[in-house]
UniProtKB/Swiss-Prot annotation:
Disruption phenotype: In plants missing both EIR5A and EIR5D, enhanced V.dahliae virulence leading to altered accumulation of reactive oxygen species (ROS) and reduced activation of cell death. This phenotype is due to both impaired V.dahliae EPD1 effector-triggered immunity (ETI), associated with cell death, and compromised pathogen-associated molecular patterns (PAMPs)-triggered immunity (PTI), charaterized by ROS production.
Main localization, broad class: membrane
Name listed for the protein in its UniProt record: EPD1-interacting receptor-like cytoplasmic serine/threonine-protein kinase 5D
Residue numbers binding ATP: L89, G90, E91, G92, G93, F94, G95, P96, V97, K118
Coiled coil location: none
Molecular function terms, GO-annotated: ATP binding; protein kinase activity
InterPro entries (UniProt xref): Kinase-like_dom_sf, Plant_Ser_Thr_Prot_Kinase, Prot_kinase_dom, Ser-Thr/Tyr_kinase_cat_dom, Ser/Thr_kinase_AS
Length: 460
């Protein structure tokens, strides 16, 4: 039995429409789907005022073909040791996240693996709607660059999600945490490519999905620094038929949201492309998308950096100093040119994510090199004498240019070894920092925007 893709209106229409209008729409949608798929059990009209047992039964029945596990709250208490502080990974806008471990002792057939258990904070920035959005999308979407949802729990007022565990945490943590090991150039391009593939998959699905909240804290990294998109609470179905956009309330994170989306509320796949350009800039510069601790003209990364992306001399000035010049100049120019296109103020001039993938893939072949260093040598003359009559008759400005081809594989292996040694340090930091990873997601809700951090919110 094929699993049909649900929209928000088919699941909780009463959240956004009058009951009569929602019922009419649901009936029409049912007839449409029945004609395509025969007899398929779809969610009845439901809202959160219904008993949770009825809600859980409807949800689990409708997602029966998705292979999601429906966990009990007691089971999740067991695997997290009652949500022990020792297993605490971090906290974000959704709520706290704890590490756990599942195997066939918990449920027959369960693969033994560490997991991240995310608990909805009823007083947090997100709620039932975002929780259900994530369940519905991740139950039906599967790709190497999307985080895997293993199961969920819905008991009384409790809403939990169980994901695969991502040991390297978030890209935000890797780039900006105080004691993080600097990411090598090749690793940064690998992360950019993986995230781009995840977005391209969403945009080119049979029923396209607009991610709407693409940012560094939502890009999680496995042990090999392979990027996976997480947190689908704000995702939306793409426009259908002859529609060019989805009209919606403006939601997202300051510094990442596309300007036309902020101005009009018109959401398209190109909105995600703009956000990707911002993250690519963060990878190039080592700067946050929004940093109010900087001078006013440098606070918004995209506005400050974009004019310099097409000029080689100016580009060198904005590259991340943590790279210490160890990057491919050609690769950096190509990546910067791509970021420039993605950040175009005209949405139609931005590339599709499939084109972004094609541009990024060759950049993995560029090795890490030392950028040119210039050393000025001025000859000294004897006091009261004249300059010697040789090759130094006149003052020279000798430019010594060194280009060292480095073994990128060796450097990455050294970086991974250093990261492994400091993993316990990162784990301790995740427990104590407001920028902690939450399977790993950063606590954007508690960061102070005035101090330069981003904030997930309604964007007015």
């Amino acid at each position: 039995m094929a699993v049909m893709k649900f929209t928000w209106r088919s699941i909780i229409p009463r959240c956004s429409k009058g009951i009569e209008e929602a019922e009419a729409e649901a009936e029409a949608e049912t007839k449409k789907q029945d004609s395509k798929q025969g007899s398929f059990s779809r969610l009845a009209m439901i809202d959160f005022s219904y008993p949770s047992s009825m809600f859980t039964e409807d949800l689990s029945t409708s997602l029966a073909g998705s292979n999601l596990y429906v966990f009990t709250l007691e089971e999740l208490k067991v695997i997290t040791q009652c949500f022990s502080s020792a297993n605490f990974l971090g906290e974000g806008g959704f709520g706290p996240v704890h590490k756990g471990f599942i195997d066939d002792n918990l449920r027959p057939g369960l693969e033994a693996q560490p997991v991240a258990v995310k608990l909805l904070d009823l007083e947090g920035l997100q709620g039932h709607r975002e929780w259900l959005t994530e369940v519905v999308f991740l139950a039906q979407l599967s790709h190497p660059h999307l985080v895997k949802l293993i199961g969920y729990c819905c008991e009384d007022e409790n809403r939990l999600l169980v994901y695969e565990y991502m040991p390297r945490g978030s890209l935000e943590n890797q780039l900006f945490a105080k004691y993080s090991v600097p990411l090598p150039w090749s690793t940064r391009m690998k992360i950019a490519l993986g995230a781009a593939k995840g977005l391209a998959y969403l945009h080119e699905a049979e029923k396209p999905v607009i991610y709407r909240d693409f940012k560094a804290s939502n890009i999680l990294l496995d042990s090999d620094y392979s990027a996976k998109l997480s947190d689908f609470g704000l995702a939306k179905d793409g426009p259908e038929g002859d529609k060019t956009h989805v009209s919606t309330r403006v939601m997202g994170t300051r510094g990442y949201a596309a300007p036309e989306y902020i101005m009009t509320g018109h959401l398209t796949a190109m909105s995600d492309v703009y956000s990707f350009g911002v993250v690519l800039l963060e990878l190039l510069t080592g700067r946050r998308s929004l940093d109010k601790s900087r001078s006013p003209r440098e606070q918004n990364l995209a506005e400050w950096a974009r004019p310099m992306l097409n000029e080689s001399r100016r580009l060198a000035r904005i590259m991340d100093p943590k790279l210490e010049g160890q990057y491919s100049e050609t690769g950096a120019r190509k990546a910067a040119a791509l970021a420039y296109q993605c950040l175009s103020h005209r949405a139609k001039q931005r590339p599709k994510m499939s084109d972004v993938v094609n541009i990024l893939e060759p950049l993995l072949d560029y090795g890490e090199t030392s950028v040119a260093s210039f050393v000025y040598t001025v000859p000294t003359h004897q006091k009261g004498g004249s300059p010697p009559k040789d090759d130094t008759d006149t003052k020279e400005c000798e430019a010594k240019t060194e280009l060292k081809k480095e073994n990128g594989h060796h450097r990455n292996r050294h970086h991974h070894r250093r990261s492994h040694k400091s993993r316990d340090g990162h784990r301790h930091q995740n427990k104590s920092s407001s920028q902690s990873s939450v399977h790993s997601e950063n606590d954007t809700s508690k960061q102070n925007l005035e101090n330069g951090s981003n904030e997930e919110c309604n964007i007015d």
